[in-house]
């Protein structure tokens, strides 16, 4: 079993983009920005615990940081990890959470 404090550090934020919105509508998949060292099993456990939904599958990828310039200096942004979490049929995550 994964410790609860680790589960809280795995998911950093939902990743909102045009592609993630299209994927969410078509395939019941939610996209998260996750810790770079997070495993698929940790991501699955964290989503199931935090959002109380059943997860059908997890796919991950690492985005390489871009090279940026500030005058003559060249720097590089950090690499980051993205997770596509497919939810079980009938499950849904509401990020707004506003109940009237």
Swiss-Prot record:
Domain of life the protein comes from: Bacteria
Gene3D superfamilies named among the record's database cross-references: 3.30.70.330
Any one GO CC term of the record: ribosome
Keywords: Ribonucleoprotein, Ribosomal protein, RNA-binding, rRNA-binding
GO molecular function terms noted in the UniProt entry: rRNA binding; structural constituent of ribosome
InterPro entries reported in the protein's UniProt record: Nucleotide-bd_a/b_plait_sf, Ribosomal_uL23-like, Ribosomal_uL23/eL15/eS24_sf, Ribosomal_uL23_CS
Xref: Pfam families: Ribosomal_L23
UniProt signal peptide: none
Any GO BP annotation: translation
HAMAP family referenced in this protein's UniProt entry, alphabetically: Ribosomal_uL23_B (MF_01369_B)
Protein family membership: Belongs to the universal ribosomal protein uL23 family.
Subunit relationships: Part of the 50S ribosomal subunit. Contacts protein L29, and trigger factor when it is bound to the ribosome.
Record function comment: One of the early assembly proteins it binds 23S rRNA. One of the proteins that surrounds the polypeptide exit tunnel on the outside of the ribosome. Forms the main docking site for trigger factor binding to the ribosome.
Record-given protein name: Large ribosomal subunit protein uL23
Natural source organism: Shewanella amazonensis (strain ATCC BAA-1098 / SB2B)
Gene: rplW
